[in-house]
Structure formats: C-alpha cells, structure tokens
C-alpha cells in the first residue's frame, strides 16, 4: 500500500507539471512570438495584425503536442496503477470471502455426512427387520431338531431296557442245558469206575456263559447309571455310540452262548472218548 501511494504521488506530480506547462504555453502566444510589441502598444493598435510565419506555427504545434503526450502517458499510468490497486483489493476481498466460505463449506459437508449416516442407519434397521424372522425360524427349527433327537434317543433307551429281560432269559437257558449235560457226563464217567479227568478241572474252566452273564450284569449297571440327558452334545453322542457298539458285542456273545450247548456236548463227548481209550489201555 505504501508503494502504491508513492506511485500515485509521482503520477499526480507529473500531471500537475504537464498541466502547468500546457497552460503556460497557451496563455499568451502573441507575446512570446513578438516581445517588442509589448513596449509599444499604441503603435500596434493602429497597424494591422500580422500573421506569424509558418515555422512559428509548427513550433507551437510541436510544443503543444508534447505536453498532450505527457498528459496521455500520465493518464495511462494512473489508470494502470488504479487497476493494479483495484486488483489487489479484489484479491484481498476474494481471500476474505474464501476464508468466510470455508466454514460454510465445512458445515455443509458435516450436514451431508449426517444425512448419509442417517440413511445408512435406516438401511441397517431395515435389514435387521428382515433378518429377525429368519433368525426366529432358524432357532425354531434347531429346537425342533433337538427335540426329535432327544425323542429318538429316549425311545432307543426304552427299547434297550425292554430287551434286557429277554437277554437275561436267553442267557439263563443255555446255562441250565450245559449244566445238565455236564452232570450226565459225570454220571457216565462214574459208571466206568475211573476218574481220569477230575470234575474240578472242568469246573475251573470258565464257560462262555459266565463271560456273557458278567457282561449282562455290567450292562445292567450301565443302564442304571445311564440317564436321559436333557441337552445332548457331541460328548454325550460319542458316549451313546460307544455304548451301542458294546451292545452289539454283547449280542454276538449271546448268540455264541445260544450255540454253546452243541460245542459243550462235543467237548464232553471228546473227554468221555479219551477216558474210554485210557480205560481200555489200562485194562
């Protein structure tokens, strides 16, 4: 601003000097051209006025044109300076307006962001409203499946408990038959009069019926300890499967017991045949 004021002062001085020169040159051109006529005004009034020569007119026009050019240049310089100062003022005003517009723009951006957040919240609420019935259906289906599994396991447990008395009866019947046959074999040997094979050795050998009876007792204890779990998990399911595997093994054992009397008869027949051979040799 100080530089602009100094330039304006210089331009003002140039304008004043140019104006003073122009006004001084044009004030009295006749006196400058003929200075001697001023001393004799009376004679000049009677004589006719003479025209100045052409050279003087040309010099006068040149002298008048020079101050006009200076005035023109000074005016142009002043206009340029004015525009420059006006441009600086405009830039300052623009900066001020920009500084004022920045908070307005930030406020507008915040308002837009809040609107976007509100829209996203609405979308999320709509999605949750659509997903809630799906979650409810899934939970109901899972509960129904769990109830079905519990019912199936409960029915399996009841069937196993119902089948245990039948197994006990089957296990007791083969035991009685083998006992009677063994008693008959003892009588046959006693009729010969020689006891080459003692009855203690036969009694000391464990029969498969004893194994099956022990396993049945263990199964009864397991069934008493086994209770229906309210909530089935993977661990209880694994226990149930291992228990079913043991049940299959016990069933095979009971089948072997059902076939046992024939094997026991063959074994007793073999022992009686060996006794007869030894008796014939000693006799």
Curated annotation (Swiss-Prot):
Residues 1-24 form the signal peptide. GO terms for cellular component: membrane. Residues 176-187 have a biased composition (Gly residues). Residues 104-134 form a coiled coil. Residues 30-62, 164-207, 258-283 are annotated as: Disordered. It is a single-pass membrane protein. It is found in: Membrane. The chain crosses the membrane at residues 65-85. Keywords: Coiled coil, Membrane, Signal, Transmembrane, Transmembrane helix. Residues 47-62 have a biased composition (Basic and acidic residues). InterPro entries: CCDC107. This is Coiled-coil domain-containing protein 107. It comes from Homo sapiens (Human).
């Amino acid at each position: 601003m100080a530089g602009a004021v100094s330039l304006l002062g210089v331009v003002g001085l140039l304008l004043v000097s140019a104006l003073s020169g122009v006004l001084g040159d044009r004030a009295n051109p006749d006196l400058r051209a003929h200075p001697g006529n001023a001393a004799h005004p009376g004679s000049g009034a009677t004589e006719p006025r003479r025209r100045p020569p052409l050279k003087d007119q040309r010099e006068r026009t040149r002298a008048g044109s020079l101050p006009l050019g200076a005035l023109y240049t000074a005016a142009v310089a002043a206009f340029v300076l004015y525009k420059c100062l006006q441009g600086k003022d405009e830039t300052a005003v623009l900066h001020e307006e920009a500084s004022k517009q920045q908070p307005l723009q930030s406020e507008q951006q915040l308002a837009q962001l809040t609107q976007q957040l509100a829209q996203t919240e609405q979308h999320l609420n709509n999605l949750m409203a659509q997903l809630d019935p799906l979650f409810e259906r899934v939970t109901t289906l899972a509960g129904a499946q769990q109830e079905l599994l519990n019912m199936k396991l409960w029915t399996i447990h009841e069937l196993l408990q119902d089948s245990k008395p039948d197994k006990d009866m089957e296990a007791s019947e083969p035991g009685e038959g083998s006992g009677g046959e063994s008693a008959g074999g003892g009588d046959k040997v006693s009729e010969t009069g020689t006891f080459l094979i003692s009855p203690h050795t036969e009694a000391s050998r464990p029969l498969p019926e004893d194994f099956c009876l022990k396993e049945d007792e263990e199964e009864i204890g397991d069934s008493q300890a086994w209770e229906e779990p309210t909530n089935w998990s993977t661990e209880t399911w694994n226990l149930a499967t291992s228990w079913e595997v043991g049940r299959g093994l016990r069933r095979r054992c009971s089948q072997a017991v059902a076939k046992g009397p024939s094997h026991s008869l063959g074994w007793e027949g073999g022992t009686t045949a060996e006794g007869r051979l030894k008796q014939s040799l000693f006799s």
